[in-house]
A protein has these predicted regions:
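Boundary/linker segments flanking structured domains
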Residues: 1-197
Length: 197
């Protein structure tokens, strides 16, 4: 899959100019320098040989090597813009954390890096929110395509084809390329960082 639009997360955090509200599909690219740390918690379950041989999931962006680890759809009323705001600018509140309203991708990255979302029982861990934002600002680039005429079902079909024609270990739902054990492990560690002791 070739994506037309591209912007570093740090730039998107500063300004949403040029990002439209059309529905579409997007891809998260992670700097290769961060992969060992990011995937350490699930290293025994990630097929690194498979990941390394997926040529379409590797490229040089802005002078650094990147690997695509996650693909998603933006089918809501605010399309790509709304989805990026949710993934990038979402505030961690006690209610959002407890009710599971934090973006699954934010929870997954936080869990993999052991950034606890709550502390002292029921207080938001603002340091973890800041650490997560810094991590994605320094290590992630987003690419996307708009599909203004596609329905949510059509977008899900395209997303499914992309996920299952490659190896995207951070995609859980509908991903036939990762093991049940890995899905269970990701769910477990996501629950751990959101739980109240």
């Amino acid at each position: 899959m070739k994506f037309v639009e591209q912007k570093p997360v740090s730039d998107i955090r500063i300004t949403k100019d040029g990002i439209g509200k059309d529905v579409g599909i997007y891809c998260w690219w992670f700097r290769d320098d961060c992969l060992k740390n990011l995937l350490n918690e699930i290293s025994e379950l990630v097929d690194l040989n498979r990941l390394n041989t997926e040529k379409e999931q590797h490229k040089v962006l802005n002078g650094s090597k990147y690997t695509a680890l996650y693909v998603g759809i933006a089918a809501g009323k605010d399309g790509i813009l709304g989805r990026f705001k949710w993934h990038i600018n979402q505030k961690h509140t006690v209610s959002n954390v407890q009710k599971g309203y934090i973006s699954t991708l934010r929870r997954t990255i936080s869990a993999l890096l052991n950034f606890k979302l709550l502390k002292n029982g029921a207080e938001v861990n603002l340091q973890s929110q800041e650490n997560l934002n810094t991590f994605i600002d320094e290590n992630c680039i987003l690419e996307w395509n708009y599909y203004p005429k596609k329905t949510k079902k059509e977008l899900e079909h395209i997303e499914d084809e992309i996920i299952n024609s490659g190896y995207f270990p951070l995609n859980i739902q509908g991903n036939k390329q990762i093991s049940k054990e890995m899905r269970d492990k990701l769910s477990e560690i996501r629950d751990t960082i959101c739980s109240i002791p």
